[in-house]
Amino acid sequence: MRVGTKSILFGVHNFVIHTAFIALAWRRLYGFPRDPRLWLAFLLHDAGYFGKRLMEGREGETHVELGARIMGRLFGAEWADFCRRHSRYYARSHGLRISRLCVADKLAFVLSPSWVYLPLARASGELWEYIDRSKDRQAGNEYFTAAEWSQVNSKDPREWLKGLQSFTYRWVLKNRFADEPDLRAHRGHAGFVDRRRYGPMRLLPKKQ
C-alpha cells in the first residue's frame, strides 16, 4: 500500500480525524461551518493523496486535483477552485491566491497535539519524509526563528513538531483573513485563537 493511501486511511490525512481538526480550525477562524459544501470540501480536499508514492514534491503537489474535480462536478467551478487552492505550493506555482481552506488546513496542523499527530505519521510512514523536507518546503518569505530552527533540526520528532507548528502558526496569523467573497464565506466578526498547548482556546477580536 502506497504512503498516500495509508495517509488517508490511518495517517495524518485520515478522513475522520483530519476533517474534524479542519472543522475546528474553520470554526476558530471564520465561525461554525454551516454550509454543507464546506464539510464536503473538508472531507475531499486531500482525496488525491490516494495512490501517491510520495507526499511531497511534484507528485504530492498534484493531490489537490481529485478533490477539486469532484467539488467542481457537484457544485461548480468556484468550489473546485476553492478546493484546488488549499495548497500553498500549488497556488504559488500556478500564480493563484490561497483559499481560506488553505489557512484552515494549516491551523488544523497547528491544533493537532503530538499524541495524535505523531502516531498517525509513524503508522503511515510519512513522518520522516515530512521531517526531511520541512526545512526547505515552507512557502512565502517568512523564516524560522532561532528556536524554531533548532527544533526542526532536532532528532526528537516531538521537538520537530513543536518547531514546525510554531512556524506554521505565524504563517496562519499572517494569512488568516484570506478573502473568499465569491463563496459568500463568513463575513462577520472573524476572531482568532490564542494558541495554548492543550488547554482551552480563547478567541481574540479581529484587529481593525
Which role does the model predict for each range below?
Residues 4-35, 44, 48, 54-55, ...:
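Divalent metal-dependent phosphate-bond-processing catalytic cores, especially two-metal-ion Mg2+/Mn2+ enzymes
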Residues 19-27, 61-74:
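An active-site-proximal "capping" alpha-helix that borders the catalytic cofactor pocket
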Residues 33-39, 62, 78:
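Alpha-helix N-cap and coil->helix boundary residues
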Residues 41, 82-86:
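Short acidic/histidine-centered micro-motifs embedded in hydrophobic/aromatic stretches
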Residues 48-53, 64-68:
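Conserved, aromatic- and glycine-enriched, well-ordered alpha/beta core segments
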Residues 58:
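Acidic-and-aromatic substrate-binding clefts and catalytic sites of carbohydrate-active enzymes
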Residues 74-82:
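Short helix/loop segments within enzyme catalytic domains
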